[in-house]
Amino acid sequence: MKKNYLYAISTILIWATMAASVKKMLFDIPNLEALSISSFLGFLFLLIWNIKTGMIKEIKSYSMKDYGIISGLGFIGLFLYSALYYYGLAQLSSQEACILNYLWPIMLVIFSCIILKEKMTPVKLLAMLCSFVGIIILSSGGGNLADGNKIMGIISCIVAAACYGLFSVLNKKADYDQRLSMMVIWLVVGVCALVMGLLTETWVPIRGVQWIGMIWLGVVIDAVAYLLWALALKGSENTAVIANMAYLTPFLSLIISAIFLKEKIEARAVIALIFIVGGILLQNLFGQKSE
C-alpha cells in the first residue's frame, strides 16, 4: 500500500476518535478549559516540529498584517468552531454532534458561492437539500425537541460547521504555509479559550488519565493528524480519492462512540449521516462537471 494511503487511513482513524474523546473529557472538565489546554499542547507540538524541520525560520517573512489575518482565521475557524462544537457535544450525544459537524463541506460550498463568486449549480442545490434533509431526520428524535439544551446543542453544531466552512474558504484565499499558520492558529485558540474560560467557567485541576486525553486531543488529533493529512494529500496522485476518504470518519466515529461511550447507534442517525455525506459526495463527484 502506498504511503499516502497509510497516512490518510491513520488520519481518518485518529479523527474518528475526536467526538468520543471530547465528549468523555467534558464529563469532568469545563468546555473552554479542555479547549485551551489541548490547543496549547497542539501549538507546542507544532512549534517543536517547525523548529526541528527548520520551518520556523520562515516565520520572519510574515508581516504584522499577515499575523493579523492568521489570527482572525484562528478566531473564526477554530476558536469559534471548537467552542461551539464542544458546547454541542456537551448537550447532544457524540454521534449527533459528529454528524452535524459534517455539514461543514456544504457550508464551504455556500461560502464559496458568496465570497469566491463560484457558480451555484443544480448539483450544489441538490447536495445542500440532501444535507438539510439529514438535519431534519437527525433532529426528529432522540429526545424532546422542547428541551432547550438539545435545541441549543443542534444550533451550536450547525453554526460551528458554518464557522469551519467559512474558515476553509478564507484559508484557501490566504494561502499561507499551513505548518506555520496552524501553529499560530492553535496559539490564538488557546489564548482566546483561556481568557473566555477564566471569565465564564470554574476551572478544575487536570489529574492523571485526564492528561492522556488532553495530549491525545491536543497533540495527536489537533497536530499529528493534520500533518499526516497534509502528507497524504501531498503524496497523492489523485487528491480527490484521498479527500473523499475523509467522509468515512463520521461512520467510524459512530462505532467508536458505541464502543467507548456505550451510545446506541440509532437508525435515524445512520440515515441522517447517509443524507449528509451523500450530499457532500454528490457535490464532490458531480459538482465540477455541472459547472
Task: Tell me the role of every PLM-derived stretch.
Residues M18-A19, L47, T53-Q95, I137, ...:
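Specific transmembrane alpha-helical segments of multi-pass solute transporters/efflux pumps
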